[in-house]
Amino acid sequence: ETASNAFLHTWSLGVEEQFYLVWPLLILLIAPWAQGQPRRLAWFWLLVASLSLLACLWLVQSQAMLAFYLMPTRAWQFAAGALAWLLAQHLRPSLAQAKSASWLGLGLLVLSLIAIDASTLYPSMWALLPTMASMALLWAGSTDTLPAAIKPLCSAPMQAIGRLSYAWYLWHWPILVIGQQILPIHGHLGNTVLALGLSLLAAIAT
């Protein structure tokens, strides 16, 4: 059922809008206590991340779909982004640390591609892999001298793809689902590339 729903992926828009509503309220709530105190702020986001992750790991065992789609069980990933920002602002890495973090991030991304597939219970502990990878790469990129391992990620073409990535994400799924009704896509590399190319053009146009 989900594989034939052309608008399934728009759940992320709902989570995003909830994030825009809830996150500012959290910041206002803790501002008097944490203003000018990055360590306190870090502890707060770590607490949010821990509670949300525990809820996610508990719920995914019995209601994997709810754990996947609900904002409270994905809030730990938003909190991880907040922690990455705090690290980049207040604990910038040395070049040696940035090199280590960049290779760690890339390694975790590769491991994610290998370990996570359609049969993987998700989001579970496996969701830590791409999340920690993103944190490591963001922290590594906050140094003045970029490590060689992540310089390609900061190139103009990659930045252009980054700017288009969310629009591309919004277009790719309906084109794949609708395209499957016209041409066989699953298991056909050429048609898959064609569908992804069309979704990229749609992202550029919009």
Predicted regions and their residues:
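Membrane-interface helix/loop caps of multi-pass membrane proteins
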Residues: 1-206
